[in-house]
A protein has these predicted regions:
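N-terminal chloroplast transit peptides
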Residues: 1, 5, 14-16, 20-23, ...
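Chalcogenol-based redox active-site neighborhoods
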Residues: 39-237
């Protein structure tokens, strides 16, 4: 039977994906591979899309039709007007007048490793995903990474408490995507209502250089932890 989408232990029935015939003509025409170098090498682009979409050429074509953010995309342009909320205590939120951080301030002029996950205090996220980056922070910094960022569809106060519990705030910057707009823009939103989580994020990781996505990995299921950990991204930098 299907596994629980976050813990991998309980039965879970995933909501059906849209069939290609249900896509709008505009969506079918979008090409997620935007940088000239990748676009000029269709086999490389297709391989990247296949990895992004689950491995098969058919899945890769479907990914392209749906307009997934992918290698070569500009992550800031893909989510215009979107800001994230840095993890902090309530008092810090009040003191900063509940300020948010524009994506350009996070990515422009920097080498960033960012990973997204379904939510704070959930199983794989707490036991494997965050620790993989915390434990490899020195190796990431040695490769010239300016910041390692964890983002989830949570408020910044929950993320702050979780980060402190994991003793990960010194290594990783945590940001909330309060209304899910960042993940919606990248087509990384998933409905996890069956796990009482509502609409959340897929489990994913990316290496972003000055806003341009250089490597992009998305798990097939939120309970998986095979391609989005620090060990994988280290080999892609």
């Amino acid at each position: 039977p299907p596994v629980h989408p976050v813990t991998g232990k309980k039965t879970y029935s995933a909501a059906p994906s849209r069939a290609p015939s249900q896509l709008s003509s505009a969506a079918r025409q979008r090409n997620p591979i935007q940088d000239n170098n990748t676009h000029s090498q269709p086999s490389v682009a297709m391989a990247a899309l296949a990895r992004r979409a689950g491995g098969s050429p058919a899945a890769a074509l479907w990914a392209a039709a749906r307009g997934f953010a992918s290698v070569g995309s500009d992550i800031v342009s893909a989510a215009p007007g979107v800001s994230l909320q840095k993890a902090r205590s309530w008092d810090e939120g009040v003191a900063t007048k509940f300020s948010t951080t524009p994506l350009k301030d996070i990515f422009h002029g920097k080498k960033v490793v960012i990973f997204g996950l379904p939510g704070a205090y959930t199983g794989v996220c707490s036991q494997s995903h965050v620790p993989s980056y915390k434990n490899n922070i020195d190796k990431l910094k040695a490769k010239g990474i300016d910041s390692v960022i964890c983002v989830a569809v949570n408020d910044p106060y929950v993320l702050n408490g979780w980060a402190e519990k994991l003793q990960a705030k010194d290594a990783i910057e945590f940001y909330g995507d309060l209304d899910g707009s960042f993940h919606k823009s990248l087509d990384l939103e998933i409905d996890l209502s069956a796990a009482l989580l509502g609409r959340r994020s897929h489990r994913w990781s990316a290496f972003v250089d000055d806003g341009k996505i250089k490597a992009f990995n998305v798990e097939k299921a939120p309970s998986d932890f095979k391609v989005s950990g620090a060990e994988v991204i280290l080999d892609q930098i």
